[in-house]
């Protein structure tokens, strides 16, 4: 009975890492205790790049300052050593803890060494027993084979552990490189792509955290697996280096434990399955931005010129125009304009300006030669905004119908005995994924072109008039139509 108690006490004061009696024991918050040298070495080996520490047994995290010396356990170890070295205890080594007789037999059914009284007891009655000398060599060979197998598995486990760490480092480098590439691309469009860049980086951060989190967990699993194998190997080595009794004591259980050991491989993540960054047609955006930046070099200082009588009211700084109905006497015939011209007049060179049309449901802008008599009263009719009448313009009607106004197309209507010819104004529908709040107008007088840019959508081209015939000076043109919200000329700084 006393021997059994000593065994229990010895188990309580044995270090789970080195499997020897505790030396300078330190206790954690979770209640587990280890040798000072063992827990220090374990921390350095298992978490070389992290400040966080965890218990090797239960994995509970703990701060380093919470490691405290356990004098109570140290005293128990010293007393236990004294008892184990005493002559009385030495005489009991190799004796049955229950009967006090020598352990000379081995029970194959139970896999334990027993004494002759145990053999005759009800517990072992009918069991096949042999002398320990007869079975020692057999089990020594088995344990030797098991030891070699475990050593090989340990090597494989350590390689898998190293592979996980290498993969983790590779992922960090790959993610970091992806960040660098993404940021380099967005740098060219910083002002107009901040929102897209932020979204992509957030997705990438989430992917990195998710993958690395699982890889860290996989690494921890591999560390535990390796440590478990080390414990088994240490047990096998202890048995093989100890006495015959130590070799055979509980040997079947040890072998069964070893046979059930399976090497768990870490989870990996294939590059082919990861989300690859795809910029939203970045090349086209870069090209559009480049073209917009190029024409913005020719920014012209344009002001608005009042025209009377007119429904268009101009601000004091001559940079904004809005629609306002003017009351006049019905008996007096007056032609009212809906648009105004810009200044200066243009006879050569390249010129660019931008107009803010935010929230307007109707507007027309571009260039014109000058107001013509036949374009005054019926200026709201589309056929009046044709290049042949001196207008190169685009516009918005009814909130979302964008159009460019081209010269009329002639067609013939053949009837019985007669033929008539009519002109149909060509209104070109303009389709845009993002409606413009700000429109850029670029006139190249010598090239005879007028281009319109959607500044709101990264400067994509809205429409371009080619082969224009400028036989007279031309002017910037602005018409707020019947929408009371203003049209505003923008400054380069805005």
Curated annotation (Swiss-Prot):
Posttranslational modification, per the record?
Answer: Degraded in a proteasome-independent fashion in the absence of viral infection but in a proteasome-dependent fashion following exposure to restriction sensitive virus. Autoubiquitinated in a RING finger- and UBE2D2-dependent manner. Monoubiquitinated by TRIM21. Deubiquitinated by Yersinia YopJ. Ubiquitination may not lead to proteasomal degradation.
Key word Acetylation present in the record? yes
What this protein catalyses is:
S-ubiquitinyl-[E2 ubiquitin-conjugating enzyme]-L-cysteine + [acceptor protein]-L-lysine = [E2 ubiquitin-conjugating enzyme]-L-cysteine + N(6)-ubiquitinyl-[acceptor protein]-L-lysine
InterPro entries associated with the record: B30.2/SPRY, B30.2/SPRY_sf, Butyrophylin_SPRY, ConA-like_dom_sf, SPRY_dom, TRIM/RBCC, Znf-RING_euk, Znf_B-box
Stretches annotated zinc finger (B box-type)? 91-132
Cited function: Capsid-specific restriction factor that prevents infection from non-host-adapted retroviruses. Blocks viral replication early in the life cycle, after viral entry but before reverse transcription. In addition to acting as a capsid-specific restriction factor, also acts as a pattern recognition receptor that activates innate immune signaling in response to the retroviral capsid lattice.
Mind telling me what this protein is named?
A: Tripartite motif-containing protein 5
What organism does the UniProt record list as the source? Saguinus labiatus
């Amino acid at each position: 009975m006393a021997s059994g108690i000593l065994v229990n006490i010895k188990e309580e004061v044995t270090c789970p890492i080195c499997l020897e009696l505790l030396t300078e024991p330190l206790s954690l918050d979770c209640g587990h205790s280890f040798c000072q040298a063992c827990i220090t070495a374990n921390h350095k080996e298992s978490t070389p790049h992290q400040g966080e520490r965890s218990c090797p047994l239960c994995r509970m995290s703990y701060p380093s300052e919470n490691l405290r010396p356990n004098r109570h356990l140290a005293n128990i170890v010293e007393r236990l050593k004294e008892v184990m070295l005493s002559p009385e205890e030495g005489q009991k080594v190799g004796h049955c803890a229950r009967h006090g007789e020598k352990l000379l037999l081995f029970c194959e059914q139970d896999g334990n060494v027993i004494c002759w009284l145990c053999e005759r007891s009800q517990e072992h009655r009918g069991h096949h027993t042999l002398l320990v000398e007869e079975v020692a060599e057999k089990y020594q060979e088995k344990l030797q084979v098991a030891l070699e197998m475990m050593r090989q598995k340990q090597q494989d486990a350590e390689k898998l552990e190293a592979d996980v760490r290498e993969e983790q480092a590779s992922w960090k480098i790959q993610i970091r490189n992806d960040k660098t590439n993404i940021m380099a691309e967005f740098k060219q469009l910083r002002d107009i792509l901040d929102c897209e860049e932020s979204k992509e980086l957030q997705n990438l951060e989430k992917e990195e955290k998710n993958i690395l989190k699982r890889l860290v967990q996989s690494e921890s699993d591999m560390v535990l697996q390796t440590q478990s194998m080390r414990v088994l190997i240490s047990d096998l080595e202890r048995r093989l280096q100890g006495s015959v009794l130590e070799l055979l004591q509980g040997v079947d259980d040890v072998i069964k434990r070893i046979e059930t050991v399976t090497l768990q491989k870490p989870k990996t993540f294939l590059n082919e399955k990861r989300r690859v960054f795809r910029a939203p047609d970045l090349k086209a955006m870069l090209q559009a931005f480049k073209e917009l930046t190029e024409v913005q070099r020719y920014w012209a200082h344009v002001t608005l010129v009042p025209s009377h009588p007119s429904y268009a009211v101009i601000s004091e700084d001559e940079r904004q125009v809005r629609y306002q109905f003017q009351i006049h006497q019905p008996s007096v015939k007056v032609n009212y304009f809906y648009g105004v011209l810009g200044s200066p007049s243009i006879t050569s060179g390249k010129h660019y300006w931008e107009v803010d049309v935010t929230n307007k449901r109707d507007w027309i802008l571009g260039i014109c030669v000058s107001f013509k008599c036949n374009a005054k009263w019926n200026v709201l009719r589309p056929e009046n905004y044709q290049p042949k009448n001196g207008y190169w313009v685009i516009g918005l009607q009814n909130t979302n119908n964008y159009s460019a106004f081209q010269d009329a197309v002639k067609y013939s209507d053949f009837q019985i005995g007669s033929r008539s010819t009519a002109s149909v104004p060509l209104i070109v529908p303009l389709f845009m994924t993002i409606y413009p709040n700000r429109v850029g107008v670029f006139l190249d007088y010598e090239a005879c072109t007028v281009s319109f840019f959607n500044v709101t959508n990264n400067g994509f081209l809205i429409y371009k008039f080619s082969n224009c015939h400028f036989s007279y000076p031309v002017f910037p043109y602005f018409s707020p139509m019947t929408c009371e919200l203003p049209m505003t000329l923008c400054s380069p700084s805005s």
